[in-house]
């Protein structure tokens, strides 16, 4: 008799998430190094086409101060939410975002999301995105990874999240740190369904 694992059972019921052209999107920043990734994502989301919300963990604010000269620059109309306020619309399943990106994502945040912790609005929004079957993209930067990290990623993948590690592409001919960051951000935009030419595509270069 054939044995079915829990993983195979869960995978069989995960359906592709179809995103609208005009997104209500939440960009969440945690305390991992790599604030530039979040800044470049915000730079390339058109506020005339998308409703943009931002939330930051306490340590994210410290990283922003250390890594982004002049601080985080928000698109026109973007709303910055209080981490401790549960009055944000995406804190309820009745008004979830179309998509949420945690960029960069610490392993601590990933572990809390994987196990359903919701002690602040960032974690609650991720919990809502999962339970309402909305697009959730997590961009971890940690290396190397422990077995605990891998198991947490497995749980999140089975729950429907996308794990998109911040691994820059070096075939793009990048000349600056921003160019390298853009190769990651381009993949995030791709998974959001946002058309972009932020980084060269494979085989676009002259043969």
Functional labels for PLM-detected ranges:
Residues 9-11:
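Cysteine-centered motifs
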Residues 6-7, 21:
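Ala/Thr-enriched low-complexity intrinsically disordered regions
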Residues 18-207:
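A cross-family phosphate/adenosyl-ligand binding-site feature
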């Amino acid at each position: 008799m054939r044995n079915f694992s829990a993983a195979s059972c869960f995978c069989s019921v995960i359906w592709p998430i179809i995103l609208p052209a005009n997104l209500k999107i939440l960009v969440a920043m945690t305390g991992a190094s790599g604030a530039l990734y979040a800044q470049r994502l915000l730079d390339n989301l058109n506020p005339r086409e998308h409703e943009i919300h931002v939330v930051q963990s306490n340590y994210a604010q410290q990283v922003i101060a250390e890594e982004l000269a002049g601080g985080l620059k928000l698109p026109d109309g973007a709303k910055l939410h209080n981490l401790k306020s549960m009055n944000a619309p995406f804190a309820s399943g009745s008004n979830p975002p179309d998509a949420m990106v945690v960029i960069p994502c610490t392993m601590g945040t990933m572990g809390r999301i994987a196990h359903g912790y919701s002690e602040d609005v960032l974690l609650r929004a991720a919990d809502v995105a999962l339970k309402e079957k909305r697009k959730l993209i997590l961009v971890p930067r940690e290396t190397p990874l422990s077995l605990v990290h891998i198991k947490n990623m497995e749980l999140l993948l089975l729950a429907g999240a996308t794990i998109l590690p911040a691994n820059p592409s070096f075939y793009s001919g990048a000349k600056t740190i921003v160019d390298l960051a853009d190769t990651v951000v381009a993949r995030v935009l791709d998974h959001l369904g946002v058309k972009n030419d932020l980084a060269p595509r494979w085989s676009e270069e002259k043969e």
